[in-house]
C-alpha cells in the first residue's frame, strides 16, 4: 500500500503480465501491437490532471481500451490493470446496493469500448464504487 496520498504507478511489466494472464485464462491472440500505445495508456493516469483514484481509473480504462496496444484482450487487460491500480493504491471497487457488480462492470467496459461513454462519465461511474480499504 502506498504511503501518504500517492497512488501505485503501473509499469509496462504489469501491463504485459495482465495481458498474458487474460489470454492464457480466456483465450485470444497474445502480443503487443505497439509498446508506445501501451506505455502511453498506462502513463496517462499519472499526468498532473488525474489526482483522485477514480480519475486515474477513468484515464486508465479509456486509454488502455482505446489505444488498442495489444493484439487482443484490451478490455480484459484494462479491467485487470484497474483492479491492480486500486488494490495497490489502497482502494477497492464495490457494487452499489443490490447491483450485480460483474454484469455492471461488463456493460460499463463494453460501453467504453463502443465509444458510448466520455471520460467524465467513466469517472462518474467509478466514483461511488471507489472505496478506501480498511
Range-by-range predicted roles:
Residues 1-134:
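FIC/Doc superfamily catalytic core
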Amino acid at each position: 500500500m502506498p504511503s501518504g496520498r500517492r497512488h501505485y504507478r503501473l509499469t509496462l511489466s504489469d501491463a504485459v503480465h495482465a495481458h498474458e494472464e487474460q489470454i492464457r485464462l480466456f483465450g485470444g491472440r497474445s502480443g503487443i501491437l505497439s509498446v508506445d500505445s501501451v506505455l502511453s495508456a498506462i502513463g496517462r493516469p499519472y499526468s498532473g490532471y488525474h489526482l483522485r483514484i477514480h480519475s486515474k481509473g477513468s484515464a486508465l480504462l479509456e486509454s488502455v481500451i482505446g489505444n488498442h496496444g495489444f493484439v487482443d484482450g484490451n478490455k480484459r487487460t484494462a479491467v485487470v490493470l484497474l483492479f491492480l491500480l486500486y488494490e495497490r493504491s489502497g482502494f477497492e471497487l464495490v457494487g452499489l446496493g443490490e447491483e450485480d457488480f460483474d454484469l455492471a462492470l461488463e456493460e460499463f467496459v463494453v460501453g467504453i469500448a463502443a465509444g458510448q461513454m466520455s471520460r467524465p462519465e467513466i469517472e462518474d461511474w467509478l466514483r461511488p464504487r471507489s472505496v478506501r480499504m480498511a
